[in-house]
Regions:
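Class I S-adenosyl-L-methionine-dependent methyltransferase catalytic core
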Residues: 1-143
Length: 143
């Protein structure tokens, strides 16, 4: 996998075989970021990457200037890999080792997250949310 744009543009990252996840393809990632760049600015965005796996999406957001990136995955191998790579690449990514559904139910509603990214099997589901009169409004984008 590689980082497509931003401060780490062109950097290749090889995930260990111990991570039982497939990284999002460059094609799918380019599609996601093309859509996002047309509807919002990534700079200063706060991102929650659920089922982070290899951290591929987290690295891309952080490289492109997202203010805060929080990666959540229950696998220790994913947690270690993302934490190590983020430090090596000097990217601002906080990694949490926890079951995603447990994390969601215990997460504080006031956490200022601009974008939530779900990756399930091959599909990428991006939930773009914004606060409106105290509620989170979601727009679903499926690639």
């Amino acid at each position: 996998m590689r980082i497509i744009a931003g401060t780490c543009k062109g950097r290749r990252i090889n995930a260990p075989k111990s991570i039982k996840a497939r990284p999002t393809t460059d094609f799918a990632k380019e599609g996601l970021f093309n859509v996002l760049n047309n509807i919002t600015t990534i700079n200063k965005m706060k991102v929650l990457d659920l089922f982070a796996g290899t951290g591929n999406i987290s690295y891309e957001f952080s490289s492109r200037g997202a203010e805060k990136v929080l990666a959540v995955d229950q696998q220790m191998s994913s947690f270690r890999f993302i934490s190590e790579k983020a430090k090596e690449l000097n990217l601002s990514i906080k990694c949490i080792k926890k079951d995603v559904f447990s994390f969601i139910t215990k997460a504080n509603d006031d956490v200022p997250i601009t974008l939530i990214v779900f990756k399930l099997v091959v599909n990428i589901l991006a939930l773009i949310c914004r606060r409106h009169k105290g509620f989170l409004l979601f727009k679903l984008i499926k690639f």
